Amino acid sequence: MQITDQEALLRCIEHREIFHDEMLTLFRRIMSGEMSPVMMAAIITGLRVKKESIGEITAAAEVMREFATKVPLTDTTNLLDIVGTGGDGANTFNISTASMFVAAAAGARIAKHGGRSVSSSSGSADALDALGANINLKPELVAESIAQTGIGFMFAPNHHAAMKHAAAVRKELGVRTIFNILGPLTNPAGAPNILMGVFHPDLVGIQVRVLQRLGAQHAIVVWGRDNMDEVSLGAATMVGELIDGKIREYEIHPEDFGLPMIASRNLRVANAAESKTRILEVLANTAGPARDIVTLNAGTALYAAGVASSISAGLQLAREAIASGAARAKMEQFVRVTQELGSKA
């Protein structure tokens, strides 16, 4: 169904839904560079003001997937993305990046999709760069990295070239828009499982329902009540879980897993170098809140990937992967293999 840019803007102003086919049309115009910067800014701001619906987000994500440069993978068994929307303002070390190594060492296959920092002190790409990994592999080499190490990192700008049409508008607006929640929904390797952190409690229910419509297999969407886009140690965590096509919403608490509560300020870092130090401490099995929060998030990831039967079972696997040195070895292998693959390219 066709809709003009002006009609779409009017719908936003009147707080009315833009239907699925109409949203497909609009986002194809954005991603192909056909929409003017003025109309793009007006529409994405209007969507934010009226609050994007589940249907609108789903359609926009479908278009972004359509335009993405894919990673050629045929086997997606136990394949997982661990990703956050960012923007929680917590400035913690890269918990999901550390958790990725632990989960992979315990049997998950990871296709992590991320970028450099926008609002935080260190994005996943910044942390991996600091650890010495090559984050700029071509899609077929990302697939090879997954085959060899069980981990592939997809640097978002390499897979979403069409996003360049929105880049200047997003930068000048300087506020969150629908694009902030689309990135985690558009894994270029088609990972059917996901552990996703979000920056607002309303997004827990929204994103898990979008993932349901997009055909995800096992999705866990989390928001810590201390405003973290991770499973938190400082407060209860709201969870939206999609499994076997059904959605369940509940809360978990660190004490449910025998972990002490600790404020997120104890996990803060100023830059990627500090984040690297924290990650290496965790992988060296240094006791403390950093190890605890990585264990909790890696355990949840292992459950989401279908490797563990529950978060508690995943937690046990994560503990063993860290204590045995397997997680540290996995990180070292990933760094070495990505460097080797990059030098062949």
From Swiss-Prot:
Belongs to the anthranilate phosphoribosyltransferase family. GO terms for cellular component: cytosol. Disulfide bonds: none annotated. SUPFAM superfamilies: Nucleoside phosphorylase/phosphoribosyltransferase catalytic domain, Nucleoside phosphorylase/phosphoribosyltransferase N-terminal domain. It comes from the Bacteria. Mg(2+) 1 binds at residues 96, 230. Its EC number is 2.4.2.18. Pathway: Amino-acid biosynthesis; L-tryptophan biosynthesis; L-tryptophan from chorismate: step 2/5. PANTHER family: ANTHRANILATE PHOSPHORIBOSYLTRANSFERASE (PTHR43285:SF2). The keyword Magnesium applies. Pfam families: Glycos_trans_3N, Glycos_transf_3. Binds 2 magnesium ions per monomer. Anthranilate 1 binds at residue 84. Catalyzes the transfer of the phosphoribosyl group of 5-phosphorylribose-1-pyrophosphate (PRPP) to anthranilate to yield N-(5'-phosphoribosyl)-anthranilate (PRA). This is Anthranilate phosphoribosyltransferase. The keyword Iron does not apply. Homodimer.
